[in-house]
Structures are given as structure tokens and as C-alpha cells.
């Protein structure tokens, strides 16, 4: 049986700012782009959350909800350095560390001799070290696999620890709403609910074969998760799959020509980024990202050799999906080869 710890820092960027400037601790604080330049909130402290401010919210809306909000652009170099120190703490307990972002990681401590092999005690020590050495707090979840460990870390936020022991997995998962499972978004949850499936117990009653027959690949994932199964390993070396660039527009646009003009200006930056590590002939595909004025988004991606002019065709398809909704953000992405994968330029899988 594996022992997995999920560590999630509490409102990380804002917490670093409050640590370094105590005057910010009791005021509503957010890190993000300027409201005057259509910025978006990256994170906020719990004081701001009481006003309804949330991550990914337009800064202008955050200002309306919370007029006294202190909005700062953030200090990415500082956050990266704190993240480096955070990782150093993790490595005292195991080499099997999979960072998900600057402030979140999985640790596989199955074979760790620390704390007599107790994952719970290791999680407690890690949280104490983060508080003592970095002046920050973290929430932790301990469970037999990754998806349960992540769910566990959400149970006692902020600054808490929750453990799901092997013998507790079935009961914990049984009552979970399906919408809480990783990979289940609002639309998928609505689809499941239309069939009378609200909880993992409901899905169990339907049966694995029926889930797979109705939902295909999604059903295969559900068939494992509703029983608490997840065999995904903690990946100490995560392979980057894509490289992209994006920009938020000064004002929403509808016109395809205007969108294409923006994308053409992004292409040189994209090519500069991927050329550091990959040649054009190595790329496995390309795509565009559109975010609409209502903050819904879509990505149009096609496998095959890199052709800059193809972005125009992808843009056209993306705008058809938009169904007249104004565009607030545009982005480009290219797919990188997996280890040992050969790009067959003549084969266009689009």
C-alpha cells in the first residue's frame, strides 16, 4: 500500500506578501493584474475572500466586491525562491517529489524511513518546518494514492492536516459528490446529474460496465475513482508537454482579422520559446486558445508538423465555437515530443 502526501500552501503569493509586510495581514489583499488593464486575480488572502473575491476573477469585479482591496502585482522572483526552499524541505523526507506548481506538490513517502515510516508524522513535521523556517502555513492530505491525498488536503484548509487511512477509503469515497472528483467539470457533473448520478455511491449502483458504455474514456476513469482507485505514480521528473504564449486584449474583440493580427504578433515569441529546446521539425502539433468575455475558454489543437499559417485555420474554427461571444484573451501553443517519440511530418492526424 502506497503512502502519498499532498501539500498545498495556503493562499501562497498573498501569504508571502503578508509575511514580508505585516501591515497587509489584516487588510483584504489580492495579487493580480491592474483593474484598469483588464487584469485577473491570481490569489487573495482570506480577508478578501470574505468579500467574495476569488482567484481568476477580473480585477475590476474584485474592486467592486471589495472597494478597500489592496491589489499588488506580485513578486514572482521571490515566490520562486520560497518555492525552492519549500522543495528542499520536501527532499528531506523523499526524493519522490512531484511539483504541480510553485505552491503544491505530491510526495511519495512509501519507502521513506523518516518518522518510523509514518506518513502522518512526516506530514506533521513538514507543515511544522514550513511554518518555522518559511513563516508560512500549508494544508496537507495523506492517503494511499494521489487523487485521495489531494481531496484530503482540501478537508482542513487552511493550515490543517487530514488523513485517509486504507481502511477508511471506501466510506470516504462512497459519499463524495461526483463533481469533487478530479477531471469532472461543471458540464460533466450536470450530465451525470441528468442521469440521476450525484455521488460515487450512485455511480457504483449503475455499475462499471454501464459507466464505460455511456461515457467511454471518462467512464473508465470514473470506474476506478468511485472505488477510490488511482494507480498514477508520483512523477519526480515531470516531462513538459507543451509550450505556449498568450495575451489579454486591451478590449474584447469579435473580428477575425483583428484576432489574427494579434496572433501573428505572438508567433515570433512562441518560436523563440520553443527554439531554446526544440527544432520546428520536432514539434508534434499546434493549437490556439480563446478565452471569452464570460471567462469560458476553448482550445483548438491539431497534431502534425508545425506550420505557422495553420494557426489561421485553427482561429477560424475557434471563432465558430465562440458563437459570437467576444474574445478577451488569445494564445498559441505547440506540442512537444514525448521521450523517444518521432514526429512523422507526413502524417497529419487532424
From Swiss-Prot:
Question: One biological process GO term for this chain?
Answer: DNA-templated DNA replication
Q: Which reaction does it catalyse?
A: DNA(n) + a 2'-deoxyribonucleoside 5'-triphosphate = DNA(n+1) + diphosphate
Q: Which UniProt keywords apply?
A: Cytoplasm, DNA damage, DNA repair, DNA replication, DNA-binding, DNA-directed DNA polymerase, Magnesium, Metal-binding, Mutator protein, Nucleotidyltransferase, Transferase
InterPro entries in the record, alphabetically?
DNA/RNA_pol_sf (IPR043502), DNA_pol_Y-fam_lit_finger_sf (IPR036775), DNA_pol_Y-fam_little_finger (IPR017961), DNA_polymerase-Y (IPR050116), DNApol_IV (IPR022880), PolY_HhH_motif (IPR024728), Rev_trsase/Diguanyl_cyclase (IPR043128), UmuC (IPR001126)
Superkingdom of this protein's organism: Bacteria
CDD domains in alphabetical order? PolY_Pol_IV_kappa (cd03586)
Q: Which Gene3D superfamilies match?
A: 3.30.70.270, 3.40.1170.60, 5' to 3' exonuclease, C-terminal subdomain (1.10.150.20), DNA polymerase, Y-family, little finger domain (3.30.1490.100)
List required co-factors.
Answer: Mg(2+)
Query: Where in the cell is the protein located?
Result: Cytoplasm
Query: In the UniProt record, does the keyword Cytoplasm occur?
Result: yes
Report domain UmuC positions: 4-185
Q: Where is this site: Substrate discrimination?
A: 13
Q: How is the cofactor bound?
A: Binds 2 magnesium ions per subunit.
EC code: 2.7.7.7
Residues that coordinate or bind Mg(2+): 8, 103
Similarity comment text for this entry: Belongs to the DNA polymerase type-Y family.
Instruction: Read off the NCBIfam families from this record.
Output: PRK02406.1 (NF002677)
Q: What does this protein do?
A: Poorly processive, error-prone DNA polymerase involved in untargeted mutagenesis. Copies undamaged DNA at stalled replication forks, which arise in vivo from mismatched or misaligned primer ends. These misaligned primers can be extended by PolIV. Exhibits no 3'-5' exonuclease (proofreading) activity. May be involved in translesional synthesis, in conjunction with the beta clamp from PolIII.
How it assembles, according to the record, is: Monomer.
| Name of the protein described by the UniProt record | DNA polymerase IV
Amino acid at each position: 500500500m502506497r503512502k502519498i502526501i499532498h501539500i498545498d500552501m495556503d493562499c501562497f503569493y498573498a501569504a508571502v506578501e503578508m509575511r514580508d509586510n505585516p501591515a497587509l495581514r489584516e487588510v483584504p489583499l489580492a495579487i493580480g493584474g491592474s483593474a484598469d488593464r483588464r487584469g485577473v486575480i491570481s490569489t487573495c488572502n482570506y480577508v478578501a475572500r470574505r468579500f467574495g473575491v476569488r482567484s481568476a476573477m477580473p480585477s475590476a469585479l474584485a474592486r467592486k466586491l471589495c472597494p478597500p482591496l489592496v491589489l499588488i502585482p506580485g513578486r514572482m522572483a521571490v515566490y520562486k525562491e520560497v518555492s525552492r526552499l519549500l522543495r528542499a524541505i520536501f527532499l528531506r523526507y523523499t526524493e519522490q517529489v512531484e511539483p504541480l506548481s510553485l505552491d503544491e506538490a505530491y510526495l511519495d513517502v512509501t519507502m521513506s524511513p523518516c518518522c518510523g515510516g509514518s506518513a502522518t508524522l512526516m506530514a506533521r513535521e513538514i507543515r511544522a518546518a514550513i511554518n518555522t523556517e518559511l513563516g508560512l502555513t500549508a494544508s496537507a492530505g495523506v492517503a494511499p494514492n494521489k487523487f485521495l491525498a489531494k481531496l484530503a488536503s482540501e478537508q482542513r484548509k487552511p493550515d490543517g492536516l487530514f488523513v485517509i487511512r486504507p481502511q477508511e477509503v471506501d466510506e470516504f469515497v462512497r459519499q463524495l459528490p461526483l463533481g469533487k472528483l478530479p477531471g469532472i467539470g461543471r458540464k460533466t457533473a450536470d450530465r451525470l446529474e441528468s442521469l440521476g448520478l450525484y455521488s460515487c455511491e450512485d455511480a457504483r449502483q449503475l455499475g462499471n460496465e454501464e459507466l464505460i458504455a455511456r461515457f467511454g474514456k471518462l467512464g473508465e476513469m470514473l470506474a476506478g475513482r468511485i472505488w477510490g482507485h488511482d494507480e498514477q505514480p508520483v512523477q519526480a521528473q515531470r516531462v513538459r508537454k507543451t509550450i505556449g504564449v498568450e495575451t489579454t486584449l486591451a478590449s474584447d474583440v469579435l473580428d477575425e482579422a483583428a484576432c489574427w493580427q494579434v496572433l501573428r504578433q505572438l508567433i515570433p515569441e512562441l518560436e523563440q520559446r520553443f527554439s531554446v529546446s526544440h527544432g520546428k521539425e520536432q514539434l508534434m502539433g499546434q493549437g490556439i486558445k480563446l478565452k471569452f468575455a464570460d471567462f469560458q475558454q476553448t482550445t483548438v489543437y491539431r497534431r502534425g508538423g508545425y506550420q505557422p499559417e495553420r494557426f489561421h485555420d485553427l482561429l477560424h474554427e475557434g471563432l465558430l465555437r465562440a458563437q459570437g461571444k467576444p474574445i478577451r484573451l488569445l494564445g498559441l501553443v505547440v506540442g512537444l515530443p514525448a521521450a523517444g517519440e518521432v514526429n512523422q511530418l507526413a502524417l497529419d492526424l487532424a
